[in-house]
Amino acid sequence: GSIYDVNRPENAEIKMLKVLSKFVLSKKTPHIVLPICTFSTGINHFVNTTAKNKIISKKENKHTRRKYIEFIEKYENGIRGNGKSNEAFHETVSVLVSEWANKGDLLGFFRDYYRDMLPIHWKVIFFQILSVLAVIQGEYPSFRHNDLKINNILLQKVDITKKTLTYGVCKKKYLVQNIGYHIKIWDFDFACIPGVVDNDKVTTKWTKAINVTPQKNRYYDVHFFFNTMIRESMFPQFMTESCIPQEAKDFLERIVPKEYQTGSYVHERGRFLLQEEYTTPQLILEKDKYFEEFRTPNKPKKKKVNRKIKEINDFVMRADTGNGDVFDENIAKRKKFTK
């Protein structure tokens, strides 16, 4: 279709970011990446020798380098006519500039630091993901991200002066520990809100086969995040490593029971094939025992809160080194402190 077609995936993503940004600006949730600007330009700026040398020679951000090299290989195969048809590139490209998340994606963070994360880290991160979905669905029940995998969620380091944060989600209040990080959902090129943000990508034959459609299903994104997170290609350590809290594993299996992890109800890529809303982000936050401590009106004992704060501060300080191996043996002892 035309580059000016608002239903093209690239344009639908931009429109979706604009629609969702109001939730951040109105302080209903901080967990959405904000757009800054977009423009069109020639692809030559990204594939010429100068660009290649500049990006590939950088020592930081191995993931970015790897993805760029893959892009160059596809581009060069395409212009030679050796690539598949979907590897052909237009000479004019659309560039989206967005808010920067300074700690990379959640998959990389988990892989680097899971051995040293506190139980409260897992709980708060999962709360943040579910809360932003619940907030969006509260106004747009038919919203679907459709690709909410762990590496499409970014992480931002935030100030930890304020020890607890108050969340308002679907007319309920939650008091949540400040762990020093905010997740930011990102990559909306499969996303849609029928009648508000329509997306041609979710009306094709191949997406229908994997249940990526515009049909309302508030469970779909929840299932896709948790079920793909524990797959072999992502973060299987979550279910196998003893350092991951058992209550977090039990929580995941309540949200995605065994019969919804593999089998006839699930595509080989981990996608949910039923139209059933097994549960919703709002119901999970309001009813599941995993988040009970965030709902309770009773303040936790001061000694326990202070201990959590100390351990969280220690984690943030050490994680700033960017090296997951720097944690000493004392940090492992923290596992006994919090649920």
What do the predicted segments below correspond to?
Residues 1-34, 38-47:
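ATP-binding glycine-rich loop module of kinase domains
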Residues 142-218:
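Catalytic activation segment of kinase domains across protein kinase-like and atypical kinase folds
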Residues 20, 113-145, 150, 159-160:
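Conserved kinase catalytic-core helix
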Residues 1-3, 47-51, 109-114, 196-201, ...:
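Short coil/turn segments at secondary-structure boundaries
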Residues 29-34, 92-96, 127, 139-151, ...:
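Core residues of folded domains in eukaryotic genome-function proteins
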Residues 1, 40-43, 101-105, 160, ...:
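Conserved beta-strand elements of beta-rich interaction domains across eukaryotes
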Residues 30-119:
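Conserved structural core of kinase catalytic domains
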Residues 200, 209-339:
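Helical subdomain adjoining the active site within ATP-dependent kinase catalytic cores
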